[in-house]
Amino acid sequence: MNINKNILFYLKHSHVQAWNFLSSHGRFLEKNVPGLKVSICLNSKEFLDRLPEAEVIVVWFFNADWLVKAPNLKFIFTPAAGNDWIKLDKSTVRVSNGRFHGPMIAESIIGAIFYFLKAFHFSKKCNYRKNGPG
């Protein structure tokens, strides 16, 4: 199957390197999805300059006023868990947000519950004072 789609990526974060879409990610997608062409924007100016031709974008956020600059836009994908960073009322553009966060959040909550149930915070404090086991 040949996709024949150009996808515009603007996934940059100044503080969390893992949240950045790198050229190696783009090469991986192009290699494994026949016909896919990946374009990566490194800043908002570059993204807004390329937006008029885009049909599919992958972004952390999208401002509603950018929609007038995107006459060909059909899909917005975001890895973000919620939809609060992309607000499009009554738009023909389909928005799809990340749905993979559930297990990670559940594991974090269970870890926090066990931390307090097993009194790890108290044990740690005792160990610092040399009052506890260890």
Positions of predicted regions on the chain:
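N-terminal glycine-/charge-rich "phosphate-binding" loop or analogous flexible N-terminal tail
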Residues: 1-54
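A short, basic/flexible loop-to-alpha-helix module at the beginning of a structural domain
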Residues: 130-134
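Phosphate/diphosphate ligand-binding glycine-rich loop within oxidoreductases
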Residues: 55-128
